[in-house]
Amino acid sequence: MSCRAMVSPPSRTARAGAVLASSPFVTSQPTEELLREFETVYGAVELTHLTPPQSPPGPATQLLLSYAQQAQCTALAPPAPLAPPQEAWQIVAPVPVNQLPEGYECDLDAVEELVRHRASQLASPQHSSSSANASPRSSPPPSPRSSSTDEDWSAPSRLKTRPVDDRRSRKKEQNKNAATRYRQKKKAEVEVLLKEEQTLRQRHTELGEKCSDLQREIRYLKALMRDLFKAKGLIK
């Protein structure tokens, strides 16, 4: 938008100033200040409106322009008459169905279909819950196929628990056998030691008897030699 479209000519400015001055709602001092600001802004715009396109004015210039336009509009606009109380509330006439667009009926049909679908979905859980409550009373006896399938489903769990039990029982049996072998080994060692002790005791008794016999023979020989030496006169 060009600067000339945004700003009115000087004759319109003078006319706006006269209206602002004659308006009973605006005091003289603010009107003079507004006119002064408007003239400065208009002079700045007139100096630059023949130049090639340039950057937009700064925020201060935009603020002055908007403030001047608002003041001019409020001064030129006549006061709005007060509406009578009877016309304050107006009844809006309903739009006939024939004047509705074609797509609106399709939307209504789609909404009704969605409502019916939702109502059927809400009613189906109640039906399923009632049938579930009534099913235990009239439930048929379990068939052999279902029992076989239950056994098939429970078989893997049993197979999983069996190896653990078998491993534990095998471990206990191994420990028991190892303890039995250890006791048997110790018992055999004790028996061997007892036999060796018995043989050693027998050997000891035999050696003791031989020792006593030898001592007795030595005493007997000593006595004979003494008698012999006495007989020869070698010993007094």
From Swiss-Prot:
Organism of this sequence: Bombyx mori (Silk moth)
Subunit comment: Binds DNA as a dimer.
Keywords from the named record: Activator, DNA-binding, Nucleus, Transcription, Transcription regulation, Unfolded protein response
Pfam families the record matches: bZIP_1 (PF00170)
Protein name as catalogued: Activating transcription factor of chaperone
UniProt gene name: ATFC
UniProt domain bZIP: residue ranges: 165-228
GO BP terms in the entry: response to unfolded protein
Alphabetical list of PROSITE patterns matching this protein: BZIP, BZIP_BASIC
GO molecular function per UniProt: DNA-binding transcription activator activity, RNA polymerase II-specific; RNA polymerase II transcription regulatory region sequence-specific DNA binding
PANTHER family: ACTIVATING TRANSCRIPTION FACTOR ATF 4/5, CRYPTOCEPHAL, ISOFORM A
Stated family: Belongs to the bZIP family.
Role: Transcriptional activator that acts in the unfolded protein response (UPR) pathway. Acts during endoplasmic reticulum (ER) stress by activating UPR target genes via direct binding to the UPR element (UPRE) (5'-GGAACTGGACAGCGTGTCGAAA-3'). Activates expression of ER chaperones ERP72 and PDI.
